[in-house]
Amino acid sequence: DLGPRAQVHGVPLLLEPLNRYETNLINTVADGLALLETLQTKNVKLLCDLFHMNIEEVSVAGALREAGGNVGHVHFADSNRRAVGFGHTDFAPIAATLASIGYSGYLSAEILPLPDSERAAAQTISSYRKFVTEG
């Protein structure tokens, strides 16, 4: 089991639920939480990818609320894997939920470089400021 070995070294492990088109193993936050409950260690957390969550969750904010302190990292992406703001996801409740569960970790952009990498990066920065730092 990697969990206890990593814990000895102070290294967290992240489990990312993926959408049903990529795997049939762990698709939702609830699936991930069920697996975490079976582990002997507490240093395994969920990597919550907002793109995958848009496909699988009834409510992205609700799933994040359910995960609570088990959120170890967030992939900040819109419904179409483009920069936040270039899809249809409503990020205000997601940002509010992350704040309400006390998440203070990183949000990384795992996005497509569309319409080009410079504009995708600029949109990501703008959206991060709008929803996370200024929220």
Outline where the language-model segments fall.
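Active-site acidic/histidine proton-transfer and metal-coordination neighborhood
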Residues: D1-K45
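Histidine-acidic metal/acid-base catalytic patches
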Residues: I26-C48, H52-G135
